[in-house]
């Protein structure tokens, strides 16, 4: 009888945990990976909100009920930590910029800068400050300036900030916004995360992915924090993301490891 009572008690506790919800605010580039992480996390149901990290940070700072924040940079979660809204920030994943090119663009690692500077070519980026991907693109422009003076002004002036803003277009279900914008020829080349470029090419195998040359390369460190006052399951979700299982899921989606666990 005691064994049966213990089993029933355990089942009740498991059901209670399953009914708990944890609100995760995360960078849009993490959607596929963290949806899979959430499905593997058994201690609570994860209610995920995805978007540009800078815009999510603003919403959290204004009091929205996020419990875990996974950002595409370290600065946004650190600003919440500094303001007393969140706990310590942990580096949990890394990404980098790639160039995603329309099928008819003759672009490679050697001529990438020349092609981006071509006045006839449309260069797409995300929105700086609102979305770290845009900040990383501007960092690439600064590196281009050191290689070829005048490049920063030319690139920053011509760059089309097509995603990552409050009014940016959204892709329909089953499509990526980058694949959609290239198909509509809103851009000829798009500077985006390598993970996002891989997802877009799954949608259209004719799209080209160009590695950014070393002199222009920009890496992205992703930061994770738990918001003050969150449920205990929120910290356990963060630990699960940092665990071997969570890191393996992120790696499957093209991310490289953050802090070792």
Can you say where each PLM-predicted feature lies in the sequence?
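Bacterial N-terminal signal peptides
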Residues: 2-15
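Exported/periplasmic ABC-transporter solute-binding proteins
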Residues: 19-64, 71-74, 78-84, 92-95, ...
């Amino acid at each position: 009888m005691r064994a049966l009572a213990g089993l029933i008690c355990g089942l009740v506790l498991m059901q209670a945990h399953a009914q708990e919800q944890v609100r995760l605010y995360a960078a849009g580039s993490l959607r596929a990976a963290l949806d899979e992480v959430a499905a593997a996390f058994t201690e609570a149901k994860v209610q995920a909100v995805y978007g540009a990290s800078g815009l999510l940070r603003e919403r959290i700072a204004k009091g929205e009920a996020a419990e875990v924040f996974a950002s595409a940079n370290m600065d946004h979660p650190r600003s919440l930590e500094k303001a007393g809204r969140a706990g310590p920030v942990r580096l949990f994943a890394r990404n980098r910029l790639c160039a995603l090119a329309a099928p008819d663009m003759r672009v490679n690692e050697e001529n990438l800068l020349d092609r981006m500077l071509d006045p006839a070519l449309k260069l797409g980026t995300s929105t700086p400050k609102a979305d770290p991907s845009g900040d990383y693109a501007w960092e690439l422009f600064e590196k281009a300036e050191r290689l070829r003076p005048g490049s920063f002004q030319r690139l920053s002036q011509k760059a089309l900030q097509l995603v990552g803003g409050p009014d940016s277009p959204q892709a329909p279900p089953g499509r990526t916004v980058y694949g959609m914008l290239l198909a509509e020829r809103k851009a000829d080349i798009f500077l985006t995360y390598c993970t996002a470029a891989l997802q877009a090419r799954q949608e259209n195998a004719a799209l080209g992915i160009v590695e950014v040359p070393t002199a222009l390369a920009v890496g992205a460190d992703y930061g994770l924090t738990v918001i003050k006052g969150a449920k205990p399951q929120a910290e356990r979700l963060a630990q699960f993301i940092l665990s071997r299982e969570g890191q393996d899921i992120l790696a499957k989606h093209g991310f490289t490891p953050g802090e070792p666990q």
